[in-house]
């Protein structure tokens, strides 16, 4: 064996072992062959992932944090995280923030009234601890993993507090998946001033009959001066701050 190749061979073996441990850790959590995701994943889930990939492509040269409002199970947040690590694996300055009560809707406003009667506690998802573990597993495999912070509690209270304690924060992508009026309006009110030209606001339930509150909040805070666009015929819509 050529001794000049030994460091490269050792590096390759170490990388393969790291990948093996990474996949094994995920399979222990999920108890499935996670590498075979295309066999089991519904096409709409692939569509949503690719839509988030397109969003992350758009902000590659825009500095600032990625903020998801309404984490729920964490699928959306980790999709954005994965897309970042695919597109910018060595860029460690991108911070990720995920907000959720993890106890469902805090309150329901009159602007949320639709043909469905939403109530306090709807969409509760006790995923906080599991999600922290998954973030750690994925981050350990990344070359330069960005900081990912879960913010637990009512956005109306947690967001102003976080911004007061972290005055450096600017936002490159704000992904709104809160569904209802008040927290969506709060998020836009506090974060739009933190968004430079070229930054993106994305909506998960814009123009949805079941969730009128999100659209009402968007129109109140953004007006009609922005051009809303759809991504890949999915439920995800966005506008670019100009």
Residue map of PLM features:
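Conserved alpha-helix/loop element of class I SAM-dependent methyltransferases that forms part
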Residues: 50-61
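N-terminal auxiliary segments of SAM/dcSAM-dependent transferases
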Residues: 1-16
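S-adenosylmethionine/decaboxylated-SAM
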Residues: 12-43, 60, 64-242
